């Protein structure tokens, strides 16, 4: 975590009093009586305490993006999402949490991992951070190990399909959209170049096939003409 700056110290709100209203494994709510540096007073300010979260942009060896699709009761919608979850207390690090979640939800693993970015869902009220990882060359190593609260399917999407989902606002989870947009911005040119090279390769192959076909027909005609001339000579 970044060190607190002098500006942050000067602008920090000071809790006069604090009390917990709600405690659950995945959510704790506390109410604070806040005093602002400008002298203003907020008698009820609610803070939501969460464990840190993780998500992963997982890409297979052949360039497919590993997504899950599941129903979200908050919005009442089904959506494509990155594999994500909570940092358990038993996990040694956010990286371990991300690798565990990918294995549990999709059965994918191995590959090359790096922390891609760290973001906050809502710094106004949330205490936690989300650690976003990039994992390349992942591969299926097992079946899913879903919890009782999970009901999701695994989908492999191309770069263009992911980009289209983002542009159509079909990836609604902001903690997913942020690292995905970053990845698209950084790698769009690479994929466009690959697409151009693929098209050029296909054109070259098509031309090559047509030339081979023409040569075949030309040889066939030559052989037929040769046989015809020989037959004419025999008759003569």
Task: Please place each PLM-identified region on the residue numbering.
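Nudix hydrolase/Nudix homology domain
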Residues: 4-13, 78, 115, 124, ...
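Conserved Nudix-box catalytic region and its N-terminal flanking loop in Nudix hydrolases
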Residues: 10-12, 45-50, 55-100, 138, ...
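Local beta-strand/beta-hairpin segments that build beta-sheet-rich folds
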Residues: 15, 19-21, 116
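Hydrophobic residues on conserved beta-strands that form the core of alpha/beta folds
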Residues: 15, 29-31, 42-44, 68, ...
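Acidic, metal-coordinating catalytic segment for phosphate/diphosphate chemistry
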Residues: 19-55, 61
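A generic structural signal for well-ordered coil/turn residues at beta-strand boundaries
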Residues: 23, 28-30, 52, 126-129, ...
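Active-site-adjacent beta-strand/loop module that shapes the phosphate/pyrophosphate-binding cleft
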Residues: 33-38, 122-142, 155
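A contiguous pocket-lining binding segment that forms or flanks enzyme active sites
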Residues: 92-136
């Amino acid at each position: 975590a970044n060190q607190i700056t002098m500006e942050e110290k000067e602008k920090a709100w000071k809790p006069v009093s604090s009390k917990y209203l709600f405690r659950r494994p995945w959510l704790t709510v506390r109410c604070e009586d806040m005093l602002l540096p400008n002298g203003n007073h907020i008698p009820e300010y609610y803070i939501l305490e969460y464990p840190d979260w993780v998500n992963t942009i997982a890409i297979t060896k052949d360039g497919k993006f590993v997504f899950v699709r599941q129903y979200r009761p908050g919005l009442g919608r089904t959506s494509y999402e990155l594999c994500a979850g909570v940092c358990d207390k038993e996990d040694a690090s956010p990286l371990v949490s991300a690798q565990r979640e990918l294995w549990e939800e999709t059965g994918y693993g191995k590959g090359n991992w790096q922390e891609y970015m760290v973001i906050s869902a809502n710094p106004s009220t949330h205490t936690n951070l989300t650690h976003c990882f990039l994992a390349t060359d992942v591969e299926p190593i097992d079946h899913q190990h879903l919890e009782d609260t999970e009901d999701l399917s695994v989908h492999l999407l191309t770069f263009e399909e992911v980009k289209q989902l983002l542009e159509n606002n079909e990836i609604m989870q902001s903690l997913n959209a942020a690292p995905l947009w970053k990845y698209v911005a950084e790698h769009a040119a690479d994929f466009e170049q690959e697409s151009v090279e693929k098209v050029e390769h296909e054109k070259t192959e098509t031309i090559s096939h047509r030339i081979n076909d023409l040569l075949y027909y030309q040889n066939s005609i030559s052989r037929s003409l040769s046989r015809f001339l020989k037959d004419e000579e025999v008759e003569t």
